[in-house]
Amino acid sequence: MKLRWRFGLAAALFLAVFSLYPQMKLWYERGAEWQGNYAYNDIDEVAYASYVKALIDGRPRKNDPYTGRDNSPETPQKESLFSIQFAAPYTLAIPARVLGIPATWMMTIGGALAAA
């Protein structure tokens, strides 16, 4: 049985580009006034982007994007919905920190990669 990788790669590329449509439409509609915003598909992505930004900024894994509190010896934080899902946020945060990419761009890029 011969695998047809080209079809799979073409489908992945199509889905990645298609997932960028909301962001491209935002850029088109707002033009130079887009102010660094990004289009999101789910209501919890705002808090998730805040958590990723905190990791990019070097804050600890156990931080709360809703209250802004960080884990410290004086105020230890419990595990949260965000801190237990550390693989995906760090997959976005580490390259962003190294390359100097803002969280809004990483959320857009991450969405395209997830769609592919």
Name these PLM-found stretches.
Residues 1-11:
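N-terminal membrane topogenic signal
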Residues 17-116:
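Active-site lumenal/periplasmic loops and adjacent helix-entry segments of GT-C-fold
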